[in-house]
Amino acid sequence: MRDKVTGARRWVVKIGSALLTADGRGLDRNAMAVWVEQMVALHCAGIELVLVSSGAVAAGMSRLGWVSRPSAMHELQAAASVGQMGLVQAWESSFALHGLQTAQVLLTHDDLSDRKRYLNARSTLRTLVELGVVPVINENDTVVTDEIRFGDNDTLAALVANLVEADLLVILTDRDGMFDADPRNNPDAQLIYEARADDPQLDAVAGGSAGALGRGGMQTKLRAARLAARSGGHTVIVGGRIERVLDRLRAGERLGTLLTPDRSRKAARKQWLAGHLQMRGTLVLDDGAVKAVSQDHKSLLPVGVKAVQGSFRRGEMVVCVDQSGREVARGLVNYSALEAQKILGQPTDAIEALLGYVDGPELVHRDNLVLV
């Protein structure tokens, strides 16, 4: 199954606070430089990369001279504000030495729970990745409240992996992976090299609390892997202090714990599209569009749409029917009903002239279409 790692073309890499801050003694720039070298090697090998970086609060604590992690929200937010500056600058300067651009992206739970903001975040991240820029993502600790925080960056990393449809989520931690017993208490504990993410037996061995610098223990990493698995993604939980760990993972070495989904990404997404959203409208397709969608498995372009029915917003589910009313497919639209009315029957290169902007060349992308 390690071919799922070596064959992955889009990685989300999450690095924990303890690994970035030398266990609390400020940012460990030497360690960061080593990871950047490995991520640059991934990039040069044609792998698209997104980095989820913890460490803002921990770096801020060090700068402020705080020994223990505060519990008060306003103190945590103050530490995050101080630490985020240095954290992003450190990543930027280190990647720049290798000629790679980075982009800071701060997210809150609201950004991913609101459909419109979710789509905007997804479009931005996909554009950055396609441009060869490395997005550096963290939770926007300065503005979140207890009610809307992700809780830990493991969860954030899994949601980002789903957002960008990553093939692989790599969670770098201060442990070598998941063990069948607590290695701190049991010298006979064995590393679990591979398991299904939904295996209930993993819950019994994922106990233990987070470190003093972070919020996420092994239980949160297991939950993150299960969240990524819902969209068909694979997860590796692995020790960040293992020498050249990313290089060795890419080469197929059996490091850490590989947690696998129960179905492929495509099957998972199609199942979600088929059964989890309410239909908001209908697009009537001409014969050419019906063939393009159902036989050629292409995206639905505005030029092939004869009529728009119902009221829907960008990102909502619509039914695609032929001119006799027979359902052909369903999918998530890139444009609202009002916008679709203006561009139906028109070629893609006319969208900007008609609307003043372009949210996508297609009305429904083929990745967001499921045939019925």
From Swiss-Prot:
The keyword Cell inner membrane does not apply. One of its GO terms (biological process) is L-proline biosynthetic process. It is an enzyme of class 2 (transferase). Keywords: Amino-acid biosynthesis, ATP-binding, Cytoplasm, Kinase, Nucleotide-binding, Proline biosynthesis, Transferase. The keyword Transferase applies. One of its GO terms (cellular component) is cytosol. Substrate binds at residues 54, 141, 153. It comes from the Bacteria. Its EC number is 2.7.2.11. Gene3D superfamilies: Acetylglutamate kinase-like, PUA domain. Transmembrane segments: none annotated. NCBIfam families: proB (TIGR01027). Belongs to the glutamate 5-kinase family. PANTHER family: GLUTAMATE 5-KINASE, ISOPENTENYL PHOSPHATE KINASE. This is Glutamate 5-kinase. It comes from Pseudomonas paraeruginosa (strain DSM 24068 / PA7). The lineage of its organism: Bacteria, Pseudomonadati, Pseudomonadota, Gammaproteobacteria, Pseudomonadales. The gene is proB.
